[in-house]
Amino acid sequence: MSRISKAEMSKLLSVYFIMGSNNCTKDPLQVLREALEGFITIFQFREKGEGALTGEERICFAKELQAICKEYGVPFIVNDDVELALELDADGVHVGQDDEGITSVREKMGDKIVGVSTHTIEEARWVIENGADYLGVGPIFPTSTKKDTKAVQGTKGLAHFREQGITIPIVGIGGISIENTASVIEAGADGVSVISAISLAESAYESTKKLVEEVSRSL
């Protein structure tokens, strides 16, 4: 097995759905199924915050979601927990700046996908040099889903990464909706990551389809 290519990674980031049990008002397994039917390109399991599952319940839930992703041939990424990613044999892991260091993560994950949230050009250069496959850049817009976010960067912040010669695949993070997706892609992102735009939508399927259309139209 070898590391994922830049071109392949770029395609996978198109519509990146992030979800935990506490991000949904409907059955999360059904929400994920609808999102997959609508053609999300990658899924991240993020079980954090108020009301999140813990211990065995969390692991069992992750396995259920992973099995559904496998049915559809969509990569299953674990948020911030390298040990769980290894235990589940997940397709990859996504870490933040306050989590385990990129060098250690890459060593443990081998050739699997490693994504890193970055907020500055310096952080980006460091994680690229040490094995990141893609960057999560943001928050682009204000978000209520994540309580521990940094200052809003706007699409200008995202464009700045490209202007400074960062060529690695980038997914925009934070407050992204169907309405503002085009502006994120036009600023230089390869894709958009969303939580509530799909998890709280009246129809996760319809919302995903619209996001896919917006990304395709803007690339």
Swiss-Prot record:
It catalyses: 2-[(2R,5Z)-2-carboxy-4-methylthiazol-5(2H)-ylidene]ethyl phosphate + 4-amino-2-methyl-5-(diphosphooxymethyl)pyrimidine + 2 H(+) = thiamine phosphate + CO2 + diphosphate; 2-(2-carboxy-4-methylthiazol-5-yl)ethyl phosphate + 4-amino-2-methyl-5-(diphosphooxymethyl)pyrimidine + 2 H(+) = thiamine phosphate + CO2 + diphosphate; 4-methyl-5-(2-phosphooxyethyl)-thiazole + 4-amino-2-methyl-5-(diphosphooxymethyl)pyrimidine + H(+) = thiamine phosphate + diphosphate. It comes from the Bacteria. GO terms for biological process: thiamine biosynthetic process; thiamine diphosphate biosynthetic process. One of its GO terms (cellular component) is cytoplasm. Binds 1 Mg(2+) ion per subunit. Pathway: Cofactor biosynthesis; thiamine diphosphate biosynthesis; thiamine phosphate from 4-amino-2-methyl-5-diphosphomethylpyrimidine and 4-methyl-5-(2-phosphoethyl)-thiazole: step 1/1. PANTHER family: THIAMINE-PHOSPHATE PYROPHOSPHORYLASE (PTHR20857), THIAMINE-PHOSPHATE SYNTHASE (PTHR20857:SF15). Condenses 4-methyl-5-(beta-hydroxyethyl)thiazole monophosphate (THZ-P) and 2-methyl-4-amino-5-hydroxymethyl pyrimidine pyrophosphate (HMP-PP) to form thiamine monophosphate (TMP). This is Thiamine-phosphate synthase. It comes from Bacillus anthracis.
